[in-house]
Amino acid sequence: MTNPIIAFKNVSKVFEDSNTVVLKDINFELEEGKFYTLLGASGSGKSTILNIIAGLLEASTGDIYLDGKRINDVPTNKRDVHTVFQNYALFPHMTVFENVAFPLKLKKMDKKEIQKRVQETLKMVRLEGFEKRAIQKLSGGQRQRVAIARAIINQPKVVLLDEPLSALDLKLRTEMQYELRELQQRLGITFVFVTHDQEEALAMSDWIFVMNEGEIVQSGTPVDIYDEPINHFVATFIGESNILSGKMIEDYLVEFNGKRFEAVDGGMRPNESVQVVIRPEDLQITLPDEGKLQVKVDTQLFRGVHYEIIAYDDLGNEWMIHSTRKAIEGEVIGLDFTPEDIHIMRLNETEEEFDARIEEYVDTDDHEDGLINAIEEERNEENL
């Protein structure tokens, strides 16, 4: 990567009064014009990173760079970034226009230019005609748009978003995901988004940093992280997973549940203990004698687009299955899956070791042919 817009080099943060370590040797580089997400549970350190970028907190050790310049000692108001907070931090006594225009007035910009810039920005966030509206009379989604408009009106190099969608209802939150992503792509400004919501991260991001206990556990594209989680924490934090103990017999051959199965992973020691991950949506229900494994249905819930079925095998392992077909509690069913559906996780593998192994042994060709080409390829394979 050339000329990262933001870089952290060996950054840590310790709150001295409580001797609490909240960030541990954080290193990353962010490319200009991308949508990045810091994803983690409460207390993982994600908001601390955001506040350090903004200048609201100082790093205990390490260096922070913005567009190639070290900014550790640069005050907040001198950094070319803008933060959208969870509560939006709007001025309740001001109108929509006055809120959005506020950063420009601080720069003592010409009134005509302010008028032009505010109108252009409100159009971008679909708030034309709301200039005179009082903040108290806006819906949650409209307040969100005002906060974003104020953040982008100065055309900062980076926009920081600290869980800005968490207060919205589900439908509005989903709509705002589309709007935020589309706006970021149209503006070409780097967005750094903080959330604990895995679905938000997967839906909007170019690149995700998964955080846990002050460390970046794994980073990658949404597809990479979902399909190839590095460890048990990531596999369970990002989506639902069936995780079993297993043994890697050799490259591309794994043993679990007392049986051996073809896999697509390699680069491990013969007979190395591993964990096996199969996603619920990758399990196909078949007749018992046609499945690779047999399980007994225990319970099920209807989730709208699928049934979530809980079943157990003869060894007592719990299996979650997503199926459009309804099961019968107590019946024995077969489970089928392909080698590509099996993901192998080594124990205590670092991200550097993981990335090197994945690059060498796993087919990560993520070229995008589109839906039509994909359908045509499937039909051609069926006709062979």
Curated annotation (Swiss-Prot):
Q: Organism's domain of life?
A: Bacteria
Give the matching InterPro entries. Answer: AAA+_ATPase, ABC_SmlMolc_Importer, ABC_transporter-like_ATP-bd, ABC_transporter-like_CS, Mo/tungstate-bd_C_term_dom, P-loop_NTPase, PotA-like, Transp-assoc_OB_typ2
Binding, ATP:
40-47
| Residue span(s) of domain ABC transporter | 6-238
Pfam family for this entry, one: ABC_tran
Main subcellular location: membrane
- Please verify whether the record's keywords include Translocase: yes
Q: Which GO terms describe its molecular function?
A: ABC-type polyamine transporter activity; ATP binding; ATP hydrolysis activity
Q: Where are the annotated coiled coils located? A: none
Q: What EC number(s) does its UniProt record assign?
A: 7.6.2.11
In the UniProt record, which is one GO cellular component term?
A: ATP-binding cassette (ABC) transporter complex
Q: Which UniProt keywords apply?
A: ATP-binding, Cell membrane, Membrane, Nucleotide-binding, Translocase, Transport
Q: What does this protein do?
A: Part of the ABC transporter complex PotABCD involved in spermidine/putrescine import. Responsible for energy coupling to the transport system.
- What does the subunit comment say? The complex is composed of two ATP-binding proteins (PotA), two transmembrane proteins (PotB and PotC) and a solute-binding protein (PotD).
Protein name as catalogued: Spermidine/putrescine import ATP-binding protein PotA
* Source organism (scientific name): Streptococcus agalactiae serotype V (strain ATCC BAA-611 / 2603 V/R)
Q: What is the lineage of its organism?
A: Bacteria, Bacillati, Bacillota, Bacilli, Lactobacillales
